[in-house]
């Protein structure tokens, strides 16, 4: 095992749930404002998950006051407190970029049974 692999292995989180594109998740993010730290929840649909190991990232999309907001998080980031899975989505794609063009009910994803 290389030295970098050993460092990467020690930095991986073990509390990451199994989730994928189409799942609706609550990402609890640590936000530091001045000397205070608080937890902010970002709820949305996972539109992609890419990379592997310590470099793995996922992108969450939500509609906020009619404006689409996307945020990309590293899976193993220390700034993420925890991730809750709200619903499992039934999708046939690994990257859901087509959701960017859809609004309202058309942007809704069927729930996995």
From Swiss-Prot:
**Which keywords does the record carry?**
Ribonucleoprotein, Ribosomal protein
Q: What Gene3D superfamilies does this protein's entry cite?
A: 2.30.30.790
Query: Which Pfam families does its entry note?
Result: Ribosomal_L19
> PROSITE patterns given for it?
RIBOSOMAL_L19
PANTHER family cross-referenced by the UniProt entry: LARGE RIBOSOMAL SUBUNIT PROTEIN BL19M (PTHR15680:SF9), RIBOSOMAL PROTEIN L19 (PTHR15680)
Quote the NCBIfam families the UniProt record gives. rplS_bact
Describe the task this protein carries out: This protein is located at the 30S-50S ribosomal subunit interface and may play a role in the structure and function of the aminoacyl-tRNA binding site.
Name listed for the protein in its UniProt record:
Large ribosomal subunit protein bL19
